[in-house]
């Protein structure tokens, strides 16, 4: 993939996700069945709308069945799945239904709290939708297909991911909110985020919305209804980006993100990589204890691998006020972080859950809408 971001004159090449690999391999399968010819490359539209030409690394086909593989290319972001082959089998059917499942090397969800139901293959919603749509577009409306995604190296590669901590067992996940992998080289990536902030400031904006990533971006636009023109990604660099807003003299910052990401800031963790600091359960337990939560709830929350899973216990026990307490602590920590440098920056916070929607905000949402319209 020949697309880049730049830092200090050096190019960082972008790549494509496992979800894009699976969609491309699935399309190659359908094309080979329909044409009865080998396919060496396919054009696919990613979940984010980017059109890519993807090489096909392996091809095999017969009258109603085909197998194809695409090699994962993460660009200059060398993650656990970079270079591995993502295989897809497609069997055509006559019932007009297109179904998708995962095979060898694709993990299975064993716990609640993630975006995949217990027992299902770990194919996230966005790539699942994209794979099905890609096959339907190539196949037409009158034929159906059974699609199986698998990765022979998946179980071994998954040991280098956080899947087991999330209750995903047996392999990798098929991921990709946008379908594109953007290199996360820290210095280069932080510089690119700063450049976007500078651009917004130069356009005359004096207040900015910081989000960790695509989920926060979607929530701001689709749930809160705020303008996309105020949004900048902070990735995992919360402290760095807060300092940058101060350097650039923004007056107001609104941080909007999934609770599992922002909860860390309430305890003074300003770089939110899970590999660097993951105290989500401990922070929740401490705050619940201060609210007088029973020991049984504290023990249940401590055992949870995700804040989504913990949310079920918290809601059942009637302690959802913990979210209000924590967002106020996120605000206080952030403003204290900026306290000793001028100019002052007002920080507000909105957190949400994938399953439960809005959890808490430092101001009434209608007040925030008025301030940020």
UniProtKB/Swiss-Prot annotation:
It catalyses: Co-precorrin-5B + S-adenosyl-L-methionine = Co-precorrin-6A + S-adenosyl-L-homocysteine. HAMAP family: CbiD. Pathway: Cofactor biosynthesis; adenosylcobalamin biosynthesis; cob(II)yrinate a,c-diamide from sirohydrochlorin (anaerobic route): step 6/10. Its EC number is 2.1.1.195. This is Cobalt-precorrin-5B C(1)-methyltransferase. InterPro entries: CbiD, CbiD_sf. GO terms for molecular function: cobalt-precorrin-5B C1-methyltransferase activity.
């Amino acid at each position: 993939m020949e697309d880049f971001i730049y830092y200090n004159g050096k190019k960082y090449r972008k790549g494509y996700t496992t979800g894009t690999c699976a969609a491309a391999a699935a399309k190659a399968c359908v094309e080979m069945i329909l044409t009865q010819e080998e396919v060496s490359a396919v054009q696919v539209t990613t979940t984010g709308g980017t059109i890519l030409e993807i090489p096909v690394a392996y091809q095999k086909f017969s009258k109603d069945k085909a197998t194809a593989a695409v090699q994962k290319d993460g660009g200059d972001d060398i993650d656990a799945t970079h270079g591995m082959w993502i295989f897809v089998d497609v069997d055509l059917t006559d019932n007009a239904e297109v179904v998708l499942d995962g095979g060898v090397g694709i993990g299975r969800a064993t716990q609640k709290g993630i975006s995949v139901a217990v027992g299902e293959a770990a194919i996230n919603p966005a790539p699942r939708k994209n794979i099905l749509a890609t096959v339907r577009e190539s196949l037409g409306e009158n034929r159906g297909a059974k699609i199986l995604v698998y990765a022979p190296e998946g179980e071994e590669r998954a040991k280098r991911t956080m899947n087991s901590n999330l209750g995903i067992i047996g392999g990798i996940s098929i991921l990709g909110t946008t379908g594109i992998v953007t290199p996360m080289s820290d210095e280069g990536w932080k510089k690119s985020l700063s450049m976007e902030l500078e651009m917004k400031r130069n356009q005359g904006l004096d207040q900015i919305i910081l989000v960790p990533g695509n989920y926060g971006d979607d929530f701001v636009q689709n749930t809160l209804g705020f303008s996309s023109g105020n949004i900048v990604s902070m990735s995992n660099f919360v402290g760095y980006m807060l300092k940058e807003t101060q350097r650039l003299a923004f007056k107001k910052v609104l941080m909007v993100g999934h609770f599992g990401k922002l909860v860390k800031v309430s305890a003074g963790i300003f770089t939110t990589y899970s590999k660097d600091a993951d105290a989500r359960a401990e922070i929740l337990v401490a705050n619940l204890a201060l609210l007088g939560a029973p020991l049984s709830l504290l023990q249940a929350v401590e055992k949870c691998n995700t804040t989504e899973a913990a949310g079920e216990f918290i809601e059942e026990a009637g302690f959802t006020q913990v979210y209000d307490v924590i967002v106020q602590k996120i605000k206080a920590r952030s403003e204290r972080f900026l306290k000793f440098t001028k100019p002052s920056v007002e920080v507000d916070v909105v957190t949400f859950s994938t399953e439960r929607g809005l959890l808490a905000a430092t101001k009434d949402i209608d007040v925030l809408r008025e301030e940020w319209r």
